[in-house]
C-alpha cells in the first residue's frame, strides 16, 4: 500500500 510505513517516524 502507498500508506505503508517505509521509514520510522523520526
From Swiss-Prot:
How activity is controlled: the entry says: Inhibited by DTT, EDTA and L-cysteine, but not by the serine protease inhibitor PMSF. Activated by calcium, unaffected by magnesium, inhibited by zinc.
Q: Which domain of life is it from?
A: Eukaryota
Temperature curve summary:
Optimum temperature is 37 degrees Celsius with azocasein as substrate. Incubation at 55 degrees Celsius for 90 minutes reduces activity to 20% of its maximum.
Q: What is its main location?
A: secreted
* Tissues in which the protein is found: Expressed by the venom gland.
Q: Which terms in the Gene Ontology molecular function aspect does this entry carry?
A: metal ion binding; metallopeptidase activity; toxin activity
Which EC class does it fall in?
Answer: hydrolase
State the signal peptide span: none
Any GO BP annotation: proteolysis
Keyword annotations of the record: Calcium, Hemorrhagic toxin, Hemostasis impairing toxin, Hydrolase, Metal-binding, Metalloprotease, Platelet aggregation inhibiting toxin, Protease, Secreted, Toxin
What's the record's pH-dependence note?
Optimum pH is 7.5 with azocasein as substrate. Incubation at a pH of below 6.0 or above 9.5 results in an abrupt decrease in activity.
Enzyme Commission numbers on file: 3.4.24.-
Its localization reads: Secreted
Role summary: Snake venom zinc metalloprotease that hydrolyzes the alpha chain of fibrinogen (FGA) but not the beta or gamma chains. Has caseinolytic activity. Induces hemorrhage after intradermal injection into mice. Intramuscular injection into the gastrocnemius muscle of mice causes hemorrhage, edema, myonecrosis, increase in serum creatine kinase levels and multifocal lung hemorrhage. Inhibits collagen-induced platelet aggregation, but not thrombin- or ristocetin-induced platelet aggregation.
Put simply, this protein is called: Snake venom metalloproteinase patagonfibrase
Organism source for this protein? Philodryas patagoniensis (Ringless green snake)
